[in-house]
C-alpha cells in the first residue's frame, strides 16, 4: 500500500569501475577544478584496473541496481592497462546478474596511440561479437578534450554500420575551451564535423552547451544523459535541462557511477 509499481529503471550513463572510488582519499590537496579530479582520482583509478578488479567493480553496481529496480545500465568503461577482453568480463558479470547492459570501451589519446587503437579494436570486437539477449554494444569515446581529429576520424571509420557512440560532452568548461583551441568550434560542432552524432549516439552531461549545440543535438536526434548528483559532486555546474527539453532533445537519466537509486 502507498507504493508505486513501475517499469524497471534505465541508467543511461554509468561507470561500473566507479564502485572503487567510494570513500577513496585523494593524496595531497583537494582538487579545485574538475580536470584535477580526473588527473588525481579517475585516471589513476582506471589505470590500476586489471581483469580481476574489472569483474569486482561490476558486481556491487549490479547488486545495487537489482536492489533499486534498475534493470538496464549503459556503461562507459576504461582500463588502459587491461583493454583486450575487458568488455567480455563486464558482459559475463551482467549475464550472471540477469540484468541488461549496453557496454563500450572509452577511446582516448591520453595514454598514447597504441592504447587508443587498442580501445578502438575492443569496441569493434565487442560490437561484432555480442549476441546475448541481455547485452548490447556501442562505441565509447572519452571526450573531445582527449581526442585528436585524427583519432576521431579513425573511430568514425572503424565503427560498424548501425551503431552509435557514447561520449562525454561539455561536462566542464575545459572541454569547450579545448575544442575551441583545437578547432575553433565548440564541442558539439566538432563532433558533428566528424559524424559522431545521430539517433544511436549518447552524449553525457552537456552542462556547458550553448543554444546552437542544443539545436544540433535536437536536429540530429542525439541523446543527452543528465547526471545531477555527479554534476553537484564535481562542482561542474547545472545542466540546462528545461531548455534542452524545450529544444526537443531526447533527455535521459544517468548516475555516472553513483547509486542506482535513480530517483534519489
Indicate residue ranges for each PLM-predicted region.
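Divalent metal-coordination and catalytic microenvironments
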Residues: 2, 13, 69, 94, ...
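Active-site gating loops and adjacent loop-to-helix segments of metal-dependent hydrolytic enzymes
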Residues: 20-54, 111-112, 173-200, 220-223
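Metal-coordinating catalytic core of metallo-dependent amide/deamination hydrolases
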Residues: 77-207
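A structural motif
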Residues: 70, 99, 162, 221-222
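Di-metal (Zn2+ and/or Mg2+/Mn2+) metal-binding site signature of metallo-dependent hydrolases
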Residues: 3-25
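Active-site-adjacent C-terminal substructures of enzyme catalytic domains
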Residues: 196-264
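Alpha-helical scaffold segments that flank or form the walls of functional sites
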Residues: 3-5, 24-76, 81-99, 121-131
Amino acid at each position: 500500500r502507498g507504493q508505486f509499481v513501475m517499469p524497471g529503471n534505465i541508467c543511461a550513463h554509468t561507470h561500473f569501475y566507479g564502485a572503487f572510488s567510494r570513500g577513496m582519499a585523494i593524496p595531497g590537496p583537494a582538487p579545485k577544478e574538475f580536470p584535477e579530479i580526473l588527473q588525481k582520482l579517475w585516471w589513476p583509478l582506471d589505470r590500476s584496473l586489471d581483469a580481476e578488479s574489472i569483474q569486482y567493480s561490476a558486481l556491487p553496481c549490479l547488486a545495487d541496481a537489482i536492489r533499486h529496480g534498475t534493470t538496464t545500465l549503459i556503461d562507459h568503461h576504461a582500463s588502459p592497462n587491461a583493454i583486450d577482453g575487458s568488455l567480455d568480463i563486464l558482459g559475463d558479470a551482467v549475464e550472471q546478474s540477469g540484468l541488461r547492459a549496453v557496454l563500450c570501451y572509452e577511446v582516448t589519446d591520453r595514454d598514447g596511440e597504441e592504447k587508443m587503437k587498442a580501445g578502438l579494436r575492443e569496441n569493434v570486437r565487442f560490437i561484432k561479437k555480442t549476441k546475448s539477449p541481455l547485452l548490447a554494444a556501442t562505441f565509447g569515446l572519452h571526450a573531445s578534450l582527449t581526442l585528436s581529429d585524427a583519432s576521431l576520424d579513425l573511430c568514425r571509420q572503424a565503427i560498424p554500420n548501425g551503431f552509435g557512440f557514447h561520449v562525454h560532452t561539455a561536462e566542464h568548461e575545459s572541454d569547450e575551451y579545448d575544442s575551441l583551441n583545437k578547432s575553433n568550434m565548440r564541442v558539439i560542432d566538432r563532433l558533428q564535423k566528424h559524424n559522431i552524432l545521430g539517433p544511436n549516439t549518447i552524449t553525457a552531461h552537456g552542462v556547458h552547451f550553448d543554444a546552437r549545440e542544443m539545436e544540433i543535438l535536437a536536429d540530429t536526434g542525439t541523446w543527452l544523459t543528465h547526471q545531477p548528483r555527479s554534476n553537484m559532486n564535481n562542482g561542474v555546474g547545472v545542466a540546462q535541462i528545461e531548455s534542452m527539453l524545450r529544444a526537443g532533445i531526447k533527455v535521459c537519466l544517468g548516475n555516472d557511477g553513483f547509486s542506482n537509486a535513480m530517483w534519489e
